[in-house]
C-alpha cells in the first residue's frame, strides 16, 4: 500500500506560528494578572536583597522601596560571578530576561546561599520525622502565600524565625550578619508595607480590590493541597525555585560535587510519584452502539418557547415570572424588560392576589381529595383482578379433570401439590413469553403500498447484513440522549462518514458542560485516530470528562491539548492517562497563547515534570513517537530535569524504529538556553531522533555551538532541521549551517522561512550547497521578502536539486513583485529623459518581471521529475500558467506512482508549443527592456543577477529553438512514411509558425547592440555554459567562442554530405553561425569590423545562396511532376496516399539522415547523372539581372512561384534531361501548390464528390504544409 509519506514529507507536527514575528522585539515574558505581577515585582526585590547583601543590613532596606529592572541587572551579575567563577557572561545576561523570579524563589535562594539553610534542605530528603517536614512545610506555604496573597505577614516571620532557631539548635553558627538574616528582616518589612496598605484599603477600597484579585486567589487551594502530602511538597519545589537552582546547577553539571545539594529537593522519588496516581479515578459509563439501533423518542424543548395562559399567584408578585425565564424571543424579552422597569403589577395586599391565593388553596385541596379517591379505586381494582386470576386458573383445571373422567381418590389426595407444580410451570411459561415480548418498533409505521414484497425483503436483508451506522447518526443520538441538539461544527465533520474517522476537532472555544458530555459520549464509542481540543476553555470537570472518555480507546493515535488550561490535578489526570492508554503515540501539550489573567501556577513550566518523566519511562504500551512542547519555557526549569525528560523520552520501552520527534518551538520568547541547546544536539546524535523543532527561538548567539556539534558528531538518523524564525543575523552564519547540513545523509526537510535578513545574500551559498544535499525532498522558503527576480534565481537553483518533491515559497512581499523599490527603480528614474514616461517604464518592468518569473517557475515545475508540491501565491501569475504547473505536478505524480509512465507525442508537442508561446511572450518584454538601456546604465551592467537571468534566458531560447527544429524534422519523416495523423499535422503547422517566429526573434537579438553590453564577453559565458548538461541537446556551431559548441568528436561523419553541397550557406564574418540553419546567433564580436567590400561580397553570396537553395528545391519537385504527367498509373497500381505529399520538402539541412534522403531522391541509383555546373560570381548575377529584367533574386523567385515561370525557361534542357532519369514511383503527388495544372491532378484523394470531410481536411493540410515547408527551405 502506498502511503502519503512515500511521496511527500509530513510536516503537520511543526509549529507554524501565530503571525510573522519581528526579530528585533522579543518580550522577556508573558504578562500576568495584577496579583501575580505584584508578587513578581516583590519577589524580584527580594532577590536583590539576597544576592547583593553580603556586607551590611542597611543596603537591602534602602533598596526595598524601589523596584527597577536596571537595578536587577546591575546587582545580579557581579553576585553570580562572586558565587561561582564558572558562570559565563552570556548566562548571566539572559537570567533577568528569561527567568522571572517570584517570592517562593526568594526564600529558597536565600537558603541556598546560607549554609545553615542548606542543611535544612537536606532534612527534606533525609529525615522522615514530622518535626523537620513541618518546618519545611510551614516555610514553603508561607512563602507562596506571601507571593500571591500577602495577607499573613506574621505567620511568615514566625516560620522564618522557627527555621533560624532550628538551625542554631543544631549547632550551626548563628546568623549574625548573614544574608539570611537580612532576608528575614527584609521579608518582614515588605510584608509590613503590604499590611499597612491593606489596613488603609479596608477603610476605603477593600471591596473594590477584592473582586479584582479574586482570580488570583483561586489557585490557592490547589497549592495548599499539594503541600499537605509528603511527596507533593517536593514536587512543588520543582516549580518554584527554578531560576536559582538553574544558576547553580547549570555551570556545575559537568563535575561539580556541590550540584547534588540543590537538586535533591527537585527530583522526588520516582516510585512514590507514580504510586500517587493510583488514587486517581478515570471510570466512566459509555453507551453501547449495538443497543440503540433507532433514535430514542423524546421531546426536545423549543428554543423559543411561548408564554402560557395559566398564572400562579407567585408569578403575580414577582419581578420576572418563572415561566418567562429562558424565553429568547425578542418581542417577549422587550416586554419583560418593560415589565421589569415598571415592577410587579400586584402586591401581597392586593385584592386580586388574595383571591388567586384562596382559589389556589381550594384547588389544591380538591386535587388532593381526588388523588386519594383515585388511589383507593386503583387498589380495589388491582385486588379484584388478582382474585379473578387465581379463581379462573383453579376452575379451568377442575373442568379439565372432570371431562377426562379419570379422577381417582389417590389423585384427589395428592392434588394440592400437583396444583402448585402446575402453577410453577405456568408461571415459567408466562415468564418465557414475557421475556420474548417487547415494545413494537418503530412506533410510527410508514406503509408503502406500491412496493413489491420482494423488494422490502431485500432491503431488510441488506440492512441487516450492513448494519453499520454512519457517524453523524451516532453523534445525533448521543446528543438526543443528552436532550440537546447536535453541534453544527461537529456534525459537519462527521457527515456521511463511517468509522474509523481520521481526525475530529472540537471547534467550540467556550463550551458548556452538556456540550462536553455529549461530545465525550461520541468519542468514547466512535473510533477516531486524532482528536483536537486546541484553544478550548476547559475547567477541571470538563478536562476530567475528556480524559476519562479517551483512556480506554484502542484507536486513538494523537491527542492535541494545545493552549488548554491544565492545573495540578489536571496534570495528574494527564499522567494517569498516559500510563493507562495503550494506543496513543502523539501528544501535543503546547502553550503558545497565554492570557493576561492566567495564574502563574497554571504555566506549563510550573507543572510536575518529574512525574511526567517517570510516566514516560514506566509506560509499557505503545511508545510515544511525537511530543510537542511548543511555547513551554524550559529555561525556567532545572537543567537536570530537562535532560532527564529528554532521556526518558528517547529510552522508552518498545522504542519506535522510525524514530521520535520533539517540538521545542518558541511562541513569545526563546524557550531554550545555550546549555539546553548543546544537550539537544548531543541527544540527537546519540539516539534515533528524526528532528527537533527549534523554530521561533533566538539562535543568533548559538551558531558556533551548533556548527561545532554538526561538524564533530554524526547525525545519521536526523531527517528534519528547522530554522524558521530563528533570528540568524548574517548570511555567513546560515552558510556555515548549510555547509555542514549538506553532509547529513538522511536529511529530507529543511526550513529556511522568516529569515529575510539573510536574503538575497545567501543565494550564492544556496547555489553552492543545496545541490550537495543527498536526499533533500522538501524545503520551505516562506516569508523572506523575495522579489520576482530573486525568486527566479531560487527556481534556477532548486532545479539542480533533482530529489525535491515539495517546495514552499509563500507569503513573499507583494510590493516587490512590481519592482517598485530596490535597485531597479532608481535606474529607470535617473535615466529617463523628458520624452519617457516613468509610469509606463515601471509597468513595463513589472510585466517583464511577471512574465520572466512565470516562465521560470513553469520550467522548474516541468523539469523537476520528482516535484509533486509547489506552494506559491498563485494569484500573482496568470491562470494559464497555474493550469500548466498543475498539469506538470500531476504528471510527476503519475511518474512517481508508475515507473513506466511516458508522455505521448501529442502531449510533448503541446508542451513544446506552450513553451514557445511563453518564451515569445517574454521576448517582447526583453526587447523592450533592452531598448530602454543606455550607455550610462552602469548599474545594470554590474548587476550580476540580471546578467545571470538574461544568460539563462538566452540559453533556454536556443534550446527551445533546437527542440522545435528537431521535432519538425521528426514529424516530416513520419509524414513521408505516411504515419502522421491529422492532429499531429495541425501541431506541425503550429510548430512551423513557431519556428518562423523564433527565427525572427533571434534575428532581432543579433542586431541589438545593448545585448552584448549587458552580457559581457562571450568567452566568459562559454566557460560556464560548456559544463552544463544541456550541451548535448544544442545544435553544432562553427565557432568555439559561442559557448554552445559541441565537440567535433561527437559529430557523426555523415556531415561530409553537408559540406559537399554547393550553396549551403554563406558565412558572415565575425558572427557565430549555426552549421545547419546558416543564421547568425546572438553573440557577435564586433558590429562594424568588416569593410564595404566584404559587406558587398556577403550580400552577393547571400543572394546566390538563396537562389541556389530555391533551385535545389525546384529540382526535387519538377521531375516528379513531369513523371506524373508523362507516366500514368497502371491498372493494378493504386495512387499513393495523400499523406505522403511533400515528403521531400522537409528541410534537408537539419540532420544527416534527411540529407541522405534528399540526395538519393535527386538521382536514380541505376543511372546516376551529374548535374551541369551552375555559373557563379558577379558575371552570373549581372547576366541574370540583365536577361530577366529583375532587380534582385527575390524578384526572380517571386516570378517562379507566382507568375508560373518554369525553370525550363531559365536552365534549358538540363532540367528536362534530369527529369527523364528520375523514377516514377517516388511520391508523385509532391508539388508546389500553384505551379501548373498538373500539380493539382496529383491529389486524387481530394475531390468535391467525396462526402468524407476528413479527406478534404487532410488534403488542405497537405497543401499548407507544402507551402510552409517550401518557405522553410528557402529561409534556411
From Swiss-Prot:
Modified-residue entries (Phosphothreonine), positions: 99, 264
Compositionally biased residues, Basic and acidic residues: 398-417, 1018-1036
Keywords: Cytoplasm, Endoplasmic reticulum, Phosphoprotein
Domain of life: Eukaryota
Main location group: cytoplasm
Modified residue annotations for Phosphoserine: 68, 103, 143, 260, 269
Subcellular location: Cytoplasm; Endoplasmic reticulum
InterPro entries: LRR_dom_sf
A single GO molecular function term of this UniProt record: protein phosphatase regulator activity
Region of interest called Disordered, as start-end residue ranges on this chain: 1-239, 394-417, 1016-1036, 1119-1167, 1221-1247
Biased composition annotated in UniProt, kind: Polar residues: 63-72, 178-192, 1124-1143, 1154-1164
CC terms in the record's Gene Ontology section: cytoplasm; endoplasmic reticulum; mitochondrion
Residue ranges, compositional bias (Low complexity): 27-53, 156-167, 205-218, 1144-1153
An example Gene Ontology biological process: chromosome segregation
Subunit text: Interacts with phosphatase 1 (GLC7).
Similarity field: Belongs to the GIP3/HER1 family.
Record's miscellaneous remark: Present with 656 molecules/cell in log phase SD medium.
Protein name as annotated: GLC7-interacting protein 3
Organism in which the protein naturally occurs: Saccharomyces cerevisiae (strain ATCC 204508 / S288c) (Baker's yeast)
Amino acid at each position: 500500500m502506498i502511503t502519503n509519506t512515500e511521496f511527500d514529507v509530513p510536516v503537520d507536527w511543526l509549529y507554524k506560528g501565530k503571525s510573522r514575528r519581528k526579530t528585533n522585539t522579543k518580550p522577556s515574558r508573558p504578562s500576568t494578572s495584577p496579583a501575580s505581577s505584584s508578587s513578581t515585582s516583590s519577589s524580584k526585590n527580594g532577590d536583590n536583597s539576597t544576592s547583593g547583601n553580603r556586607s551590611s543590613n542597611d543596603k537591602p532596606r534602602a533598596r526595598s522601596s524601589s523596584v527597577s529592572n536596571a537595578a536587577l541587572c546591575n546587582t545580579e551579575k557581579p553576585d553570580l560571578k562572586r558565587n561561582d567563577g564558572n558562570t559565563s557572561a552570556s548566562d548571566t545576561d539572559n537570567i533577568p530576561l528569561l527567568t522571572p523570579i517570584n517570592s517562593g524563589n526568594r526564600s529558597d535562594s536565600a537558603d541556598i546561599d546560607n549554609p545553615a539553610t542548606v542543611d535544612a534542605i537536606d532534612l527534606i530528603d533525609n529525615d522522615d520525622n514530622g518535626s523537620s517536614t513541618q518546618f519545611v512545610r510551614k516555610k514553603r506555604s508561607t512563602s507562596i502565600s506571601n507571593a500571591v496573597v500577602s495577607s499573613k505577614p506574621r505567620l511568615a516571620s514566625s516560620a522564618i524565625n522557627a527555621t533560624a532557631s532550628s538551625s542554631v539548635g543544631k549547632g550551626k553558627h548563628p546568623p549574625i550578619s548573614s544574608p539570611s538574616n537580612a532576608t528575614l528582616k527584609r521579608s518582614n518589612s515588605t510584608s509590613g508595607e503590604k499590611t499597612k496598605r491593606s489596613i488603609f484599603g479596608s477603610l476605603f477600597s477593600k471591596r473594590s480590590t477584592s473582586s479584582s484579585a479574586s482570580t488570583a486567589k483561586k489557585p490557592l487551594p490547589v497549592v495548599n493541597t499539594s503541600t499537605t502530602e509528603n511527596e507533593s511538597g517536593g514536587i512543588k519545589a520543582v516549580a518554584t525555585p527554578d531560576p536559582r537552582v538553574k544558576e547553580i546547577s547549570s555551570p556545575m553539571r559537568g563535575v561539580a560535587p556541590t550540584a547534588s545539594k540543590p537538586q535533591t529537593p527537585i527530583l522526588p522519588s520516582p516510585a512514590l510519584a507514580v504510586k500517587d496516581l493510583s488514587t486517581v479515578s478515570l471510570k466512566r459509563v459509555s453507551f453501547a452502539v449495538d443497543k440503540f439501533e433507532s433514535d430514542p423518542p423524546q421531546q426536545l424543548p423549543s428554543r423559543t418557547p411561548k408564554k402560557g395562559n395559566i398564572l400562579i399567584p407567585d408569578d403575580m408578585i414577582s419581578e420576572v415570572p418563572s415561566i418567562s425565564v429562558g424565553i429568547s424571543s425578542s418581542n417577549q424579552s422587550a416586554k419583560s424588560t418593560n415589565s421589569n422597569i415598571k415592577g410587579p403589577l400586584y402586591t401581597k395586599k392586593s385584592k386580586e392576589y388574595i383571591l388567586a391565593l384562596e382559589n389556589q388553596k381550594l384547588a389544591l385541596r380538591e386535587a388532593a381529595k381526588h388523588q386519594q379517591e383515585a388511589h383507593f379505586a386503583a387498589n380495589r381494582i388491582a385486588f379484584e383482578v388478582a382474585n379473578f386470576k387465581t379463581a379462573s386458573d383453579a376452575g379451568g383445571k377442575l373442568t379439565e379433570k372432570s371431562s377426562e373422567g379419570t379422577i381417582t381418590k389417590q389423585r384427589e389426595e395428592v392434588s394440592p401439590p400437583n396444583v402448585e407444580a402446575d402453577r410453577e410451570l405456568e408461571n415459567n411459561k408466562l415468564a418465557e413469553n414475557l421475556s420474548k415480548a417487547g415494545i413494537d418498533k418503530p412506533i410510527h409505521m410508514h406503509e408503502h403500498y406500491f412496493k413489491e414484497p420482494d423488494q422490502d425483503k431485500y432491503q431488510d436483508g441488506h440492512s441487516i447484513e450492513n448494519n453499520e451506522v454512519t457517524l453523524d447518526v451516532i453523534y445525533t443520538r448521543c446528543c438526543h440522549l443528552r436532550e440537546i441538539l447536535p453541534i453544527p461544527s461537529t456534525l459537519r465533520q462527521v457527515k456521511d462518514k463511517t468509522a474509523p474517522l481520521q481526525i475530529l476537532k472540537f471547534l467550540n472555544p467556550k463550551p458548556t458542560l452538556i456540550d462536553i458530555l455529549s461530545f465525550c459520549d461520541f468519542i468514547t464509542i466512535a473510533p477516531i485516530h486524532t482528536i483536537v481540543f486546541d484553544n478550548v476553555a476547559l475547567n477541571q470537570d470538563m478536562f476530567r470528562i475528556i480524559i476519562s472518555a479517551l483512556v480506554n480507546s484502542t484507536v486513538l493515535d494523537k491527542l492535541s491539548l494545545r493552549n488548554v488550561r491544565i492545573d495540578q490535578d489536571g496534570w495528574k489526570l494527564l499522567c494517569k492517562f498516559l500510563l493507562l492508554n495503550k494506543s496513543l503515540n502523539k501528544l501535543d501539550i503546547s502553550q503558545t497563547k497565554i492570557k493576561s489573567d492566567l495564574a502563574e501556577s497554571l504555566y506549563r513550566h510550573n507543572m510536575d515534570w518529574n512525574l511526567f518523566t517517570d510516566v514516560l519511562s514506566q509506560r509499557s504500551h505503545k511508545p510515544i513517537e511525537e511530543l510537542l512542547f511548543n511555547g513551554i519555557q524550559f529555561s525556567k526549569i532545572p537543567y537536570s530535569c530537562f535532560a532527564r525528560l529528554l532521556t526518558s523520552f528517547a529510552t522508552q520501552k518498545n522504542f519506535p524504529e522510525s524514530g521520535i520527534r520533539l517540538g521545542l518551538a518558541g511562541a513569545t520568547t526563546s524557550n531554550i538556553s545555550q546549555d539546553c541547546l548543546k544537550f539537544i544536539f548531543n541527544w540527537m546524535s546519540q539516539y534515533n531522533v528524526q528532528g527537533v523543532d527549534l523554530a521561533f527561538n533566538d539562535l543568533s548567539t548559538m551558531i558556533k555551538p551548533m556548527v561545532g556539534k554538526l561538524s564533530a558528531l554524526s547525525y545519521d538518523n536526523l531527517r528534519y532541521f528547522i530554522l524558521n524564525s530563528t533570528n540568524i543575523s548574517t548570511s555567513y552564519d546560515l552558510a556555515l549551517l548549510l555547509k555542514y547540513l549538506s553532509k547529513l545523509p538522511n536529511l529530507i526537510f529543511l526550513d529556511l522561512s522568516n529569515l529575510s535578513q539573510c536574503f538575497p545574500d545567501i543565494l550564492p551559498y544556496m547555489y553552492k550547497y543545496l545541490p550537495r544535499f543527498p536526499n533533500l525532498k522538501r524545503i520551505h522558503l516562506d516569508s523572506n521578502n523575495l522579489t520576482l527576480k530573486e525568486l527566479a534565481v531560487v527556481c534556477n537553483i532548486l532545479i539542480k536539486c533533482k530529489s525535491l518533491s515539495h517546495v514552499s515559497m509563500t507569503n513573499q512581499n507583494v510590493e516587490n513583485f512590481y519592482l517598485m523599490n530596490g535597485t531597479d527603480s532608481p535606474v529607470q528614474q535617473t535615466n529617463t529623459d523628458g520624452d519617457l514616461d516613468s509610469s509606463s517604464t515601471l509597468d513595463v518592468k513589472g510585466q517583464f518581471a511577471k512574465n520572466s518569473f512565470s516562465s521560470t517557475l513553469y520550467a522548474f515545475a516541468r523539469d523537476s521529475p520528482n516535484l509533486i508540491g509547489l506552494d506559491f501565491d498563485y494569484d500573482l501569475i496568470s491562470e494559464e500558467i497555474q493550469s500548466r504547473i498543475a498539469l506538470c505536478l500531476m504528471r510527476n505524480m503519475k511518474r512517481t506512482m508508475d515507473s513506466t509512465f511516458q508522455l505521448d507525442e501529442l502531449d510533448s508537442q503541446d508542451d513544446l508549443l506552450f513553451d514557445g508561446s511563453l518564451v515569445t511572450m517574454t521576448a517582447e518584454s526583453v526587447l523592450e527592456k533592452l531598448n530602454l538601456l543606455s550607455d550610462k546604465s552602469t548599474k545594470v551592467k554590474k548587476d550580476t543577477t540580471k546578467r545571470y537571468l538574461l544568460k539563462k534566458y538566452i540559453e533556454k531560447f536556443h534550446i527551445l529553438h533546437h527542440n522545435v527544429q528537431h521535432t519538425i524534422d521528426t514529424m516530416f519523416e513520419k509524414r513521408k512514411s505516411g504515419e502522421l495523423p491529422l492532429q499531429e499535422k495541425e501541431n506541425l503547422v503550429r510548430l512551423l509558425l513557431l519556428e518562423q517566429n523564433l527565427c525572427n526573434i533571434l534575428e532581432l537579438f543579433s542586431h541589438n547592440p545593448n545585448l552584448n553590453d549587458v552580457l559581457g564577453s562571450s568567452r566568459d559565458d562559454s566557460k560556464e555554459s560548456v559544463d552544463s548538461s544541456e550541451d548535448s541537446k544544442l545544435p553544432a556551431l562553427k565557432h568555439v567562442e559561442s559557448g554552445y559548441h559541441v565537440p567535433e568528436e561527437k559529430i557523426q561523419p555523415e556531415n561530409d554530405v553537408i559540406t559537399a553541397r554547393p550553396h549551403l550557406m554563406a558565412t558572415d564574418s565575425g558572427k557565430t553561425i549555426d552549421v545547419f540553419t546558416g543564421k547568425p546567433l546572438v553573440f557577435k564580436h564586433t558590429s562594424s569590423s568588416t569593410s564595404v567590400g566584404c559587406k558587398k561580397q556577403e550580400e552577393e553570396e547571400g543572394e546566390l545562396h538563396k537562389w541556389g537553395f530555391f533551385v535545389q528545391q525546384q529540382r526535387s519537385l519538377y521531375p516528379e511532376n513531369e513523371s506524373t504527367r508523362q507516366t500514368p498509373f497502371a491498372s493494378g497500381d493504386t495512387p499513393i496516399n495523400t499523406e505522403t505529399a511533400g515528403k521531400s520538402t522537409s528541410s534537408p539541412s537539419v540532420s544527416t539522415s534527411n540529407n541522405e534522403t534528399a540526395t538519393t531522391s535527386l538521382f536514380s541509383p541505376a543511372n546516376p547523372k551529374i548535374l551541369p555546373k551552375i555559373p557563379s560570381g558577379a558575371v552570373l548575377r549581372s547576366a541574370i539581372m540583365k536577361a530577366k529584367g529583375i532587380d534582385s533574386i527575390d524578384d526572380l523567385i517571386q516570378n517562379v512561384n507566382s507568375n508560373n515561370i518554369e525553370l525550363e525557361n531559365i536552365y534549358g534542357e538540363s532540367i528536362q534531361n534530369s527529369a527523364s532519369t528520375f523514377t516514377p514511383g517516388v511520391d508523385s503527388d509532391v508539388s508546389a501548390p500553384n505551379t501548373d495544372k498538373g500539380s493539382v491532378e496529383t491529389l486524387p484523394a481530394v475531390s468535391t464528390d467525396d462526402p468524407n470531410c476528413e479527406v478534404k481536411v487532410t488534403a488542405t493540410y497537405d497543401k499548407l504544409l507544402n507551402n510552409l515547408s517550401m518557405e522553410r527551405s528557402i529561409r534556411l
